[in-house]
């Protein structure tokens, strides 16, 4: 789906993708249980490597991947529905029962119910930080879908990392007549009669538009960018009903020492 978006906006040929051999590496510094696990891509290779780290795990992990593939088939079925018919409900309940059984449970609940050991769960859950929630809260459908995308479909990264994606999108945008302003803060979104009609910049400049796209979180958009009186009560309730997920931050630290010295 992401590649399709790049193709649609004319940025696909501006990004060079590099295939990865490894899924991820897990390292802990716990004095009681230090670990260093390097997991490969590919279903069979992943199962075999996990068996090395946790002998006896392959049977359970194979069942986990069977469930992952079953969930993916259900999602493909639903996403390809063009003209919904009542008969499809029967098909969902008869042929997609795996999805229905686990859809309302967390990753931990499902893995524990399948008999996965603590070590197997720890290794399988290596991608949890990508979705920002701990696995006792993270929905199993969301996580297993990501495991399918990476472990089974394969993983790639842009040669220039995420910055190459940003520059490619910018180039495609400007080539199609767009104009990008950097270091330009928006003070508020202008709303008239329930419709966003433009934005006001920090310096007071107003820019009118037929549509406004805001990539700030709903909370920030509704509390900092839009006048409260312009926000429908329904949207206020939706935002207030949400709970915050786990948060993290990345530190890029340059050290003036060689790896051997450190």
Where are these regions (language model features)?
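Glycine-rich loop(s) and the adjacent beta-strand/alpha-helix scaffold that form part
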Residues: 158-176, 189-190, 200-262
């Amino acid at each position: 789906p992401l590649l399709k978006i790049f193709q649609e906006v004319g940025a696909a040929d501006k990004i060079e993708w590099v295939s990865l051999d490894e899924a991820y590496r897990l390292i802990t510094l716990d004095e009681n249980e230090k670990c260093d696990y390097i997991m490969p891509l590919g279903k069979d290779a992943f199962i075999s490597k996990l068996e090395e780290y946790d002998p006896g795990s392959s049977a359970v992990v194979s069942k986990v991947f069977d469930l992952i593939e079953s969930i993916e088939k259900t999602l493909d079925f639903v996403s390809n529905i063009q003209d919904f018919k009542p008969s499809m409900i029967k098909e969902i309940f008869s042929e997609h029962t795996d999805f229905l059984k686990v859809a309302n449970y967390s990753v931990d609940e499902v893995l524990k119910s399948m008999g996965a050991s603590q070590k197997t769960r720890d290794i399988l859950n290596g991608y949890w930080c990508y979705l920002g929630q701990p696995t006792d809260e993270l929905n199993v459908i969301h996580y297993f879908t990501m495991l399918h995308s990476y472990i089974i479909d394969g993983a790639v990264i842009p040669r220039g990392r995420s910055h190459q994606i940003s520059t490619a999108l910018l180039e495609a945008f400007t080539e199609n007549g767009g104009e990008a302003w950097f270091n330009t803060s928006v003070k508020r979104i202008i709303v008239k009669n329930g419709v966003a009609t433009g934005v006001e910049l920090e310096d007071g400049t107003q820019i009118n538009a037929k549509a406004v796209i805001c990539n700030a979180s709903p909370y920030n958009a509704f509390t900092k960018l839009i006048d409260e009186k312009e926000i429908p009560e329904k949207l206020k309730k939706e935002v207030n009903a949400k709970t915050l997920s786990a948060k993290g931050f990345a530190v890029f630290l340059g050290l003036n020492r060689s790896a051997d010295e450190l």
